[in-house]
Amino acid sequence: MTAAQVDDGAFLLDVREPDEWAAGHAPGAHHVPMMEVPARMAEVPTDAEVVVVCRSGGRSGQVTSWLMGNGWDNVRNLDGGMHSWAAAGREIVSENGQPARVL
């Protein structure tokens, strides 16, 4: 799925590391680092569209496959990750007081 195809109502699951998240993420995204997903999978809805994102699409692709293998059928990977999100002109916010950017 491309950044332009992501519906505003989608549950955006950002699986990047805390420093990547703090530097810049999509507004309203939910942060669960990749290695924490198995322990925190109850936070991921089964009744809404879920779009998984990382920096470039690799980690999010792995998480998408893992979720699908564990019962989620409403999960899509964001092709190109946050790099494609930013390139598409989608909004990015930061948590560290610096201008938002993709690490």
Language model segments and positions:
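Short, surface-exposed ligand- or partner-binding patches at beta-edge/loop junctions that are enriched
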Residues: 53
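Rhodanese-like catalytic fold shared by cysteine-dependent sulfurtransferases
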Residues: 1-11, 17-49, 60-103
